[in-house]
Amino acid sequence: MGKKRKPSPERSSDEDEVSTPSPKDRTARPTAAARRENVALSQAVALSLEDASNFCSLAFSLERIKREPVDTDYDDPNQPGPSSVPVSARTDHVLPIRFKIKAEPQEYDSDEYGKDHGAVQIANKEVPAISPIEEVSQKRRGRPRKTDAAQHLFFPHVSIKQEPDDGFINFHESRCVGIAQDPEMQHLHDVNESHSSEIAIFRETKKITERKKKKTEAEKLWDNMSLTEKEVFQSHTRRRRTTRLPIIQNFEETEEGCIVEVPIPLIDLDNDAVESVTGPQHENVTVSENVLSTESTDQEVTETKRLHDSSRDFNPPRIQDTPSTVIRPEGDQKDPMSSTSSKRRNTNNSRCASLLSNPHSTPVTRLMRGILDSENSDNDEMLSNDQSEIAKRPRTPRPRYSPEAQRRTNSRLSALTIDTNRSNDLNVDGSAPSSSSAASCGLSTPDPDRTSQQRRKGNQSAARSRKIKTPSPPLSQEDEPMELDSDDDPVNELDNLPIVIDDPSYVLTKEHKEIFEQVKKSVSDRNEFSPAQISEIYRSSKGEQARLPERIHFGAFIMKTWYGSPFPAEFINVKKLFICEFCFFYARSDEIMQNHAKKCMLRAPPGLEIYRKGDISVFEVDGRLQKEYCQTLCLVSRMFLESKTVFYDTEPFFFYIVTINDDIGCHFAGYFSKEKYEPDVNNLSCIMTLPCYQEMGLGRFLIDISYALSRKEKWFGGPEQPLSELGRKAYGGYWRTTIASCLGRLKDELEFGSGISIKMIADDTGVNCHDILEVVCSLGWAKPVDPDEKNHYKLEWDVDWDMVSIILRESEASKETKVQYDPECLDWVPRKMRPSMDGYHELSKEEIEQDEQRRKSIQKTPVHVSMEKATPTSTTSLPVGSVKKELRSRGHNRSVGRNLKHEVNRKVKVPEWAAARDLTDEEITVEENKKQQKQNRKIFTRCADSVLDKSNIREETPEDDEPGPSTKPSGKRQRGNKCNNTESEPNPSGRKTSATSSGRGKYRNRRTDGTEEEEEDDDPTDSEPLTTDDEKPFETSVNKEKNEKSRRGKKVSKKRRSVAGKKFPPNFGVRDRDEPKKAENSEDGEGLESKPGPSTEMILVEKVEEEEAKVTVSDINMQASESKIEGIEQTSEVDIPKSDEDHQSTEAYDRVEDEVPITDYNIPTPDSYHSSPPHSPTPSPQPQLMQAQQNIYQDNDCHFAENDSKPPHLVSEVDDPAAPQPTVTLQSGPSDAPPLSHNSVDGYSTGDDDAPPNLSPQIGKSENNEEEMPLIAPIVQHNGITHHEESTAQHYHDSMNAGPSTSSHVTPQMSMINTTPQQPPFSHPNSQQQATPGSGGVPSCGPAYTHHTPEQQSQQFMSPPMAGMPASVASNHSIHNSNSIEMVGGPASLQHTPQQYEMGHSMAQMSQESAIGGINTVPSIEQQNQLMLQHHQFSSPPAAPPPSQQQQVVQPPIPPAPTTANGRRRSESAATQRTKARQQHQHQQQQPQQPQQRIAAPGVPQGVHPQMQFPMNAMNMMPAYPPFYPYTNYPNIWQPPYQNYPYNQVDYQQPWLYNNGHIPHQTNGTATNQFHPGHMGYFPNNNGR
């Protein structure tokens, strides 16, 4: 128990008498009229206190309110004045606060502050100004408190000016304006949020009312309230605290100054928080019983400052050396407030300010304060529908989400939430600390579940880790004992913090909880997705960003999103996200957004307005200064931009925001971002226009702004590359219009002057030179010609002025409806931004030089040095990389850190890094013999590498999957095996020839100096002139085979190179496996990279029987050297088991391949039919075509190390740079991206730059391009002659024949062949099927289809399932033969060979009898050639029809190709037998081939007659689309002629009437129109439109 303090001798009783109003003074208080006149003074008291050193401090004391109902008159002298509650206070349930204002004019400098600060003129009455000497303290039950300290309160300063008309004061300041208009109103205009958040000590009226009820009628209230009423009460009591200015309730003048009573809400004041506002100007505290004040003395400044620095806590220690100076007069020792103070439950103002409780009952005064304060305050705000001025008062809240700070976990903090660690009261930018910054403070409402010790420790440590406690001052014996403060007693902790759970009568029953859960679930189902729905949305997104949120409410628009955006998790699961269009505050419910709209003070983007014309404005926002705004802007833009990746790193960007202005504000419509620190790289990084504003031309307007800024910066800007589809559409339209306008101005200079350059156009438009060149070349207005020595080109202009005039007319017409840029309205000055301006470190020149030196020092070893070290020194050694590769191929997966030398012992030798040397023939022979003997004892296989290599090759150059001989130019020799020399045959050159031929594959590219030179063979037989098959007629004779044997291993072409002086043992090349890639690379320059491999290891295909393995290669070679018989006879004499078919010699296989008559498999290379002229129809041997085929076998032996090789080059390159890249097929669903419109010939949009109105997926299909029409289902009569089957009635479907009866796409080079009456390349219906690159090994033509991927199976052309696909799919595919399967995403320029076209034409011809009604429905070749080059405006990859839609066609017999076993060719004997059978079959087929074709199409000249799967039938029926169809780029589809077209009625009446208007299946859906490579279009299957 403590004692009372001694009265301080420093203060006299006279001062106390002056400061204590007597009953007489209270009776002389002004009336209501007088108070009305002095309202402004009370506002001055509250608003004129910003700096204590310059102005004044406000002293107040919180007076007690009697718990008993106040029914006496306020002016009754019998009632204690300060404790009496005025009538207005009782009515509004507010607490009157008394201020003592003491005048000390000498404290002010009259010259500095002038008359306005020296005195205040109010109602013709001069009142002295407020002096900065007042002190605030609170009575503590008539005794000192443990932690008595000054409660200082300061407000932003507002200059006071008198309004002579109404007598009120208008407060002016740069950031705060408030006018008191009504003296009776309970609230005033709010002070700016940035100045008042840290002093938000006032609450809203309803909350004040509830707190008053809670204080005065706690027991009665909670005993009589039902649960529903308590919940309503709870919702009111937890509303957010807002700032209000106090109003005057009473006013009186004294000798020393003015005493005013201001009703103030019941607040939680914090001592340390007030001290933090006070700062160093901490004043000495003196305790008074009635009205307390402070005096600032020079003697006490040092001690006071020390105490201030050491007691920055929410409960600072009381000042021990400042005893009370107030001495009561004798006879008046009793405190007038003693009766009230004795009933006070909690004297800690930082916990609960002036709370009353009944001593005979459990305190329930806080009413769920601890529970409710931890809930989200934003949800509370929506519970009020109050339309009062308090609710309408604008206020800028802190955004809900801030990526740079943690989310508030306990937002219901005290009203006065000030960060005590700050030395000043405002932030650097003038804003106040937010409520989240006080989360670290101990001012939050304690959790009732926590223990008393934890609660007390948490509050102490939150503000200050170490708390200095000073002993209490000595008390005199006269002082009666006093109790310790309630905060010191842990037992009384709950009494100090009364909450509703302390009330035993407050019980939540199970029924109440069930009702609450039902209501909560109902609201959740209405506004949020369930977990199951969220899971389904993420599952349907297939690994991509789920389209969440699905809808947004942005201003006056509700829009469906196009893509998902990474909003915080709690905002993702809502069905509709609400976003403020001014500040981008986002909320989960409409109630929260409505409440935010009442408080949001932003009506324009927080940046600098650089452009305004009419109702259009552009603002420049710095991503660093307005980080939260820009981050939310990026999150919003991600919902409409698929390629948006930057969300939170907004510091290095400027955001230029376009708004549409009205009376409400500047509404956000779109924006573009630009790099801040490197403005000369890209003038635009990201651009977005909201879908609701996409019809106004704002996209082009923003592009105009970006180029205007670049022109002011005096450099040629451009967008960041690569452009997206929408970006290319917008920029394409802008570039075309801008360049056309510039050319119109420069027409005279171009036509009649010296000409123009790209630089001139760039200077005029600001567009980058590369973009200008791309546009003018794509439009055909210019082309580069005449390159000079430096490869510089000149431009040859050929401007289509008609097109230019059309573009300019369209541009002029759009100015009436589209937003146009006006250069006169731009107010912007370029400035150079550096990272150092934003606080980032900027590298100096020295640091840049050091970084460059460090980068130069870190370089790779030169190639020739590394290759020299990696080269083995002998034939038995290999590079380490090869050792690792072989180990992996045999199932090993060993780490790099292991010692490979020990792990591969007895198999390979790890090379010793020494200089390479040449090996002699004897050394090579000895090593080879040893290797062969080892392999006879132990056989092992190595297939992993071959499988891997084949899979890699298949990705780039697909191979044959169907049986038949390979007709592709093989670039590699087939891999050998253990028994690959089981056949004895004459070899005049002996072992040296074999060794020379085989040795080239491995050592031809390797020398110590890294160079290459041609090989010099010492064999006299090799000096003979070599002859190739190109110089010989096509025949299969013994002499040819013998010559092939004699030329084995010789230098065939000049491209063969080897290291001079190297000699290799016989048959050394048989064991060559991996190195042939190096030979291919050196030969044509386009081969694969050379990879080191185990060349000396006998790599076998499969394990054979032990007795079969004993037949070694050396024994067979000895037999071959002794044998003198012919090659074919020798082949028949050698008996090889069938089990060893796959182990035949490479030489034998080569002979068999050479014997194959290539004449019937002449798939030409591009040179064969691009450069050579077409030929006559007479079939004859063609050495020109054969030359390309013979090159396959005349090259060096290393070409056959792999099973298969890349196919011949097709019509054009695989990666056609001129072909626009296709768009990925879009899935219909919630996450669909906006379907793109089609590009024109030049690759750019022909319409406006803005996105079309149907960009958003939710709009659905349009009537023009995506309407699904019922298909006509005629009974199709199949041609039995063509299909070799009976004609059967089938349901109509739009697929083509699977066999070669349907033709393929034709290239322009092939069109030239058609127009020339010369002989086409010789072809046979049994031509080998050729797989196109990227098809995964699937042949481009032929009856067999292998769908390797779901994409290929799903892309069914001219089939009913494709008709139902969206336009985004239908517009991104090209017309293609149903037999052609090209990879999705590849160029559409992969064509087929003329032989396939002729084959398809010949098989598709119909006789007169098989035609419709005896009429030949196949048009003449002249008619087809006229339609060749029509409709060439689409470019997309085709796909293959499904197997279910293929017509079964009996394919003509195809000679079977050597089947593969484990990736190897079969035996020579089997190949020889197949060769003989194939020769006989080909001779039988060659004779009737041409007459049969002539009979099939009499009157049509023999030539390439391709029939394409184009939507116009062979009878030249009218297009399926009417004239002026908006999407004219779609190819025309077969449809009956319209009756309003007379020429169709006259010309095609008979074919249409036949068979009820149905045409045969063979001709349905075919046409002869031709496209440019890479510009084939796909059309939807909407026949019958």
Curated annotation (Swiss-Prot):
Catalytic residues, chain numbering: 720
Compositional bias (Low complexity): 431-440, 1164-1173, 1482-1493
Residues that bind acetyl-CoA: 685-689, 724, 815
Region called Disordered, residue ranges: 1-37, 279-491, 844-903, 927-1262, 1286-1373, 1431-1507
Domain MYST-type HAT, chain residue ranges per copy: 544-830
Biased composition (Basic residues): 453-469, 1047-1060
Zinc finger C2HC MYST-type: from-to: 577-602
Documented EC number(s): 2.3.1.48
Protein purpose: Probable histone acetyltransferase. Required to initiate and then maintain lateralized gene expression in the ASE sensory neurons. Involved in determining cell fate in the ASE neurons.
Protein name (database record): Histone acetyltransferase lsy-12
Biological source species: Caenorhabditis elegans
